[in-house]
């Protein structure tokens, strides 16, 4: 036929085609051509018709006769760039026909391009006549937008009389086949593509046609039946798609369950890994040491059970032995490592639950697996299959250890029963194994008894260690106090250096690092227990300093040269020394900031001083702080950036700057400074006021005043001052007994001083300076401290009367400022030592404890409660008598002092290292 005839017919068809009723939607792509008659023998025409898209639905009603020539449909334009770049055909946004090509050459070029790129190739396989043939559609160039089964809601046409086509897009129709040339078969639903994408077009006349390379197959059904079946099929596919697209991913339920099991296995593996990491983090070296000890203890069990594996049932007895040994180890772990045992049990329970679920699912699907095998490869589920195969192979059950025979049995699937001879040998082996197991249990019981005894001993040791005195360092300490809320200690040493120890952190490190084992080994070697302390800072002594120069030390806060707050360590003389002076270090850099040595201090005779520092034995056997009368003493007291200095029997008071050692001011007092035995005559009321104890008066000086004169002078009525204490509201915070006093506690109670017949409460608001005067009878005051309403007086009883047995030679008396009388007496045990050795050198008390120290040790009392004071009758001289609660430290201490903060007590003796312990 001529080209003009073809153009005319195509034009007529285009003019009569009309608009597509579904022009508002983007047409679904279909590679299935219009059905053509099998009588048509023109291969070129068949090829051209197989490449068309958007066929005219009205031509589906036209009957094809033998004399009728085939009709060419208009070919849509194809975007070559899209074909070459992405393998997709650019489709029209309208379902209507856009017309034919501009020329036959364009049509030929389109066909050649499609042929070259294999963009829509339909392969059909021919078989023998009379047999069914398998067919598939291969679309390598045209890719679907999705890889799952998709059936559009508009894919089935419900109105058959309109004659519109209803395409159905489908992909991955696996596991099914279509019988070709069987028109009457109503069960042919889809085309098998072997995992590749295919397209099925369901039309109103129930024609499903598939065109191959030169062959065509027509599957015909009745309209109503096919439309109903198509709708049912679309609903089924949509339902399967809503349930996680399991049909698209897995060809059968077995594959779906295997994939589910694989996910469970991976989750279990990840949980095990996380648990292992957690155990590694919670398994320090100490746990390894404990585990190694357990391993050594069960070595005897392993040796006794080693010959079990030599029998004919080697594998079974080995597994049983491991279970028995593991059972014993679990018992040990339950007692020694409960946290690790808990984590392991939780992990095993999760694993067993997942395994049981997976095994049940496999057994339920054995019949399906035997009859039906998946068409797709299952290499991706190899882990799950291997895991399930191992479960099907054998099932091992371990019974309780009540019956040893059951504990040695291993149940295997699909195995033959053993012979009678094997049964006889098995009974013999089981009998011997049972004997060994019983012996192992006896050995374990002995081990448990030994460990229980060790635990009881360790508990006793732990309790004793809590209340044991512990040395701090190895240097002899001449003074020291708690700082930083009792967590650290500042010490002054006999060599002129100072050290800063972090007591709290040192004991924590020991407790965390196998403290019990360290204490046990230390006890085996030395016979004593103790804490290991680590010095944080050491402040080196200045050059040329004499031994035993420092007897007191502080940590002081003061603004630096740059205006920022700084910290300084200050050490100074206190009482009798060969040399007198002070030294300050920067707390952080440890550099010496100031050093001052008194010029005339070296002229003091040695005979008036304490024993030489190197003669330790002499110092322990002599009276505590034996002071020769009328011996000059030097005292230093800091407050903020200033430190005051004076000497007994002198009338000069100097003030220095601790940051550079420069002298700030110099005063002259009216009376010489008093020589006190156990109290400093130089004390601060706050940063602006300095209080000095003179021989017959108390003077108050203002360091901020331009006129060097006393602001207030309080007379002692001609009596000698024996003890002196001032409440400092600007003292350092975080300390112990020398911690600053609150303004509320110091209101009306600026301090206290004692004379031979009375206790005088200082109140600088009164013109006389004395707020209250409490008489004291028959005692010689040695030291005093004040806190709130209470005044604690350390004294020696010199009264010898019939009531002498009611009071010891040394005692602590508690007075009430509000009641202005004696409320309680705390008696120290009687001693035959020298009076100076048994004299109380320091006293302090609060609402819980009353403490007093002498050469006999530190004596701790429970503070008398208000209820107790009301119930007990008061004697005229001593009030309620309280007995000592406990004595801390040795009885040969030299010039002792103490400090208390929180739950720790610090004890200083100037002939040995500092001591501390808990006090609860």
Swiss-Prot record:
It is found in: Cytoplasm. Might be involved in division plane determination. Keywords: Cell cycle, Cell division, Coiled coil, Cytoplasm. This is KIN14B-interacting protein At4g14310. Residues 1-199, 309-375 are annotated as: Disordered. Interacts with KIN14B, CDKA-1, CKS1 and CKS2. Signal peptide: none annotated. Residues 435-463 form a coiled coil. GO terms for biological process: cell division. Residues 1-10 have a biased composition (Basic residues). The keyword Coiled coil applies. It comes from the Eukaryota. One of its GO terms (cellular component) is cytoplasm. Residues 112-135, 327-337, 357-374 have a biased composition (Basic and acidic residues). The keyword Cell cycle applies. Gene3D superfamilies: YVTN repeat-like/Quinoprotein amine dehydrogenase. Residues 90-105 have a biased composition (Low complexity). Residues 35-54, 137-147, 166-184, 345-355 have a biased composition (Polar residues). InterPro entries: At4g14310-like (IPR045289), Quino_amine_DH_bsu (IPR011044), WD40/YVTN_repeat-like_dom_sf (IPR015943). Its main location: cytoplasm.
């Amino acid at each position: 036929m001529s080209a003009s005839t073809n153009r005319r017919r195509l034009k007529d068809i285009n003019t009569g085609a009309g608009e597509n009723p579904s022009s508002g939607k983007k047409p679904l792509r279909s590679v299935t051509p219009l059905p053509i008659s099998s009588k048509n023998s023109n291969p070129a025409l068949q090829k051209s018709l197989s490449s068309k898209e958007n066929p005219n639905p009205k031509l589906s009603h036209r009957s094809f006769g033998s004399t009728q020539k085939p009709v060419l449909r208009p070919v849509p334009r194809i975007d070559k760039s899209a074909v070459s770049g992405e393998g997709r055909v650019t489709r029209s946004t309208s379902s209507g026909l856009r017309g034919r090509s501009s020329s036959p050459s364009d049509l030929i070029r389109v066909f050649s391009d499609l042929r070259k790129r294999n963009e829509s190739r339909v392969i059909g396989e021919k078989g023998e006549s009379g047999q069914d043939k398998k067919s598939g559609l291969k679309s390598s160039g045209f890719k679907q937008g999705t890889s799952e089964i998709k059936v559009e809601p508009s894919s089935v046409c419900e109105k058959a009389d309109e004659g519109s086509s209803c395409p159905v897009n489908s992909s991955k129709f696996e596991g099914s086949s279509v019988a070709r040339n069987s028109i009457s078969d109503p069960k042919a639903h889809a085309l098998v593509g072997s995992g590749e994408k295919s397209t099925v077009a369901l039309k109103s006349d129930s024609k499903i046609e598939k065109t191959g390379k030169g062959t065509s197959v027509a599957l015909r059904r009745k309209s109503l039946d096919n439309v109903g079946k198509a709708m049912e099929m679309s609903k089924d596919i949509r339902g399967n798609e809503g349930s996680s697209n399991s049909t698209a991913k897995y060809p059968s339920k077995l594959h779906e369950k295997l994939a589910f099991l694989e996910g469970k296995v991976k989750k279990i593996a990840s949980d095990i890994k996380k648990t292992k990491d957690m155990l590694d983090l919670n398994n320090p070296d100490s746990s390894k040491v404990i585990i190694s000890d357990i391993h050594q203890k069960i070595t005897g069990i392993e040796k006794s059970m080693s010959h079990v594996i030599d029998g004919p049932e080697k594998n079974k007895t080995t597994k049983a032995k491991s279970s028995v040994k593991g059972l014993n180890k679990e018992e040990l772990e339950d007692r020694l490592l409960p946290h690790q045992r808990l984590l392991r049990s939780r992990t095993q329970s999760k694993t067993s639950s997942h395994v049981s679920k997976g095994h049940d699912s496999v057994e339920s699907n054995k019949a399906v697996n035997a009859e039906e095998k998946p068409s797709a490869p299952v290499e991706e589920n190899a882990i799950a299959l291997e895991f399930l195969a191992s479960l099907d192979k054998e099932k091992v059950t371990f019974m309780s250890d009540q019956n040893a025979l059951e504990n040695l049995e291993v149940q295997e699937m699909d195995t033959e029963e053993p012979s009678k001879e094997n049964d006889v040998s098995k009974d013999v082996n089981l009998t011997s194994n049972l004997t060994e197991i019983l012996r192992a249990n006896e050995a374990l019981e002995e081990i448990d008894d030994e460990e229980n005894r060790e635990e009881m001993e360790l508990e006793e040791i732990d309790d004793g260690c809590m209340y044991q005195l512990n040395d701090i360092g190895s240097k002899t300490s001449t003074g020291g106090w708690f700082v930083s809320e009792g967590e650290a200690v500042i010490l002054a040493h006999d060599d002129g250096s100072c050290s800063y120890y972090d007591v709290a952190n040192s004991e924590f490190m020991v407790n965390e690092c196998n403290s019990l084992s360290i204490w046990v080994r230390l006890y085996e070697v030395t016979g004593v227990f103790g804490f290991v302390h680590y010095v944080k800072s050491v402040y080196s002594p200045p050059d040329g300093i004499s031994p035993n120069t420092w007897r007191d030390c502080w940590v002081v806060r003061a603004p630096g040269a740059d205006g920022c707050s700084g910290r300084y360590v200050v050490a100074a003389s206190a009482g009798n020394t060969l040399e007198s002076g002070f030294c300050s270090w920067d707390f952080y850099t440890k550099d010496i900031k100031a050093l001052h040595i008194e010029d005339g201090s070296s002229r003091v005779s040695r005979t008036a001083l304490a024993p030489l520092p190197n003669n330790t034995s002499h110092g322990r056997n002599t009276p505590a702080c034996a002071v020769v009368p009328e011996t000059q003493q030097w005292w230093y007291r800091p407050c903020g950036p200033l430190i005051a200095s004076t000497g007994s029997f002198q009338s000069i008071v100097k003030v220095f700057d601790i940051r550079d050692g420069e002298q700030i001011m110099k005063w002259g007092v009216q009376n010489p400074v008093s020589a006190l035995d156990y109290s400093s005559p130089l004390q601060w009321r706050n940063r602006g006021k300095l209080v000095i104890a003179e021989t017959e008066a108390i003077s108050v000086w203002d360091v901020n005043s331009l006129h060097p004169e006393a602001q207030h002078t309080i007379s002692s009525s001609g009596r000698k001052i024996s003890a002196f204490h001032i409440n400092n509201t600007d003292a350092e915070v975080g300390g112990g007994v020398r911690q600053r006093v609150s303004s509320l506690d110091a209101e009306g109670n600026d301090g206290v001083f004692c004379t031979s017949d009375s206790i005088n409460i200082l109140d600088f608001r009164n013109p006389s300076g004395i707020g209250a005067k409490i008489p004291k009878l028959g005692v010689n005051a040695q030291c005093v401290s004040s806190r709130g309403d209470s005044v604690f007086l350390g004294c020696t009883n010199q009264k010898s009367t019939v009531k002498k047995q009611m009071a010891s030679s040394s005692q602590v008396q508690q007075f009430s400022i509000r009641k202005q009388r004696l409320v309680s007496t705390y008696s120290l045990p009687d001693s035959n030592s020298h009076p100076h050795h048994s004299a109380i050198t320091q006293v302090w008390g609060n609402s819980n404890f009353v403490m007093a120290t002498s050469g006999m040790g530190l004596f701790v009392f429970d503070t008398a409660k208000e209820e107790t004071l009301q119930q007990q009758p008061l004697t005229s001289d001593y009030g309620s008598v309280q007995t000592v609660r406990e004595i801390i430290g040795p009885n040969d201490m030299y010039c002792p002092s103490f400090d208390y903060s929180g739950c720790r007590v610090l004890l200083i003796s100037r002939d040995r290292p500092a001591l501390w312990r808990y006090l609860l």
